Amino acid sequence: MPNVQVCAIIVTYHPDPSFPARLEKVGRQVGRVLIVDNSGNNRAIAFLKGHAHKDDVEVIYNGRNLGVAAALNLGAARARDLGFEWALTLDQDSEPSEDMVRCLWSVLQGDPRPETLAILAPQIIEASLGRPARFLRAGRAVLFDRPLCDGGRTMEVTTAITSGSLLGLRAHSDFGGFREDFFMDYVDTEYCLRAQTRGYRILAVCSAKLYHRLGDRKEISLGPLRLYPTFYGPDRWYTLSRNRIPMVRRYGLRFPHWLLYEVLASAFITARMLLAEPQRRAKVKAILRGTWDGLLGRLGPPDAFAESPAGISEDRGHADSGDPLDL
């Protein structure tokens, strides 16, 4: 039975032919589905009109790529207008387990302080690797902990990706929604950290599972070393590097365990890119340009400040946080 108290918000950007099957799976678990499309071309619009127009599905066509943050905020505003208090946010290529919404909702209903919950997040299974990702939470002093979310337990965590998360719409309205000038990358992390500065909690629900694709990950062997790079395009390296600067400035001292993790993770994924990915020169230029623009406070859509030598990557409609310290 679908949960009529939950509205799904799916952000699309040139959805692939397998999207309708995932849409059907989501629709069976929620009361309504809102699709917010960032594609901005006739082919994608025709595809969605042919597969997504049903009684319980509504499509918002943005006409261009407004970024994942703006798309999520538009979806959240529409869900509130429809009377919903909770929304399930999803990327177009994420696939929930059959009981994911039921598991998230059950924990929400049993929580002693539901009014303090900003997000309930499922266990993330990386579809390309077939293994669970780890969460981040504070350890001793400034150290961080990277627990696996196993069994039926729940735990408070520092960050969660937007895809698969049950989003409290009252909390979303309370502290201003997702940061649209980030466009993409760190959108979910910034929202989680800001929520906690306002007294809200981020809760991981280990019984709920989401199968999620992080970039175009595949195994690369370098002698005895096995790496799993994401193969993001230069434009993603630009926004990652640019948005990291205001994140560290605003949250580094408040969340020292996150800052330590961020420093290590950023160094690792850059080294991994240099070792195992193509277009290294273009990506290094994008990192330098993004860092410079971040220092100058130049945010917004990346095309306004940086031209990607390789064009726009196909994953540009997403905002993955992922698990960068996972080889």
Task: Indicate residue ranges for each PLM-predicted region.
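Active-site-adjacent helix/loop segment of glycosyltransferases
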Residues: 201-285
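Glycine-rich, basic loop-to-helix element that forms the pyrophosphate-binding segment
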Residues: 62-82
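Non-catalytic, C-terminal membrane-associated alpha-helical segments of glycosyltransferases
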Residues: 249-327
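A conserved acidic beta->alpha catalytic loop
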Residues: 37-47, 64, 94-95
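Short, well-formed alpha-helical segments that are part of the catalytic scaffolds
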Residues: 10-31
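Conserved donor NDP-sugar-binding/catalytic core segment of glycosyltransferases
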Residues: 99-134
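A short, conserved alpha-helix in the catalytic core of glycosyltransferases
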Residues: 165, 171, 175-176, 181-211
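Short beta-strand-to-loop acidic/aromatic patch adjacent to the donor-nucleotide binding site
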Residues: 84-95
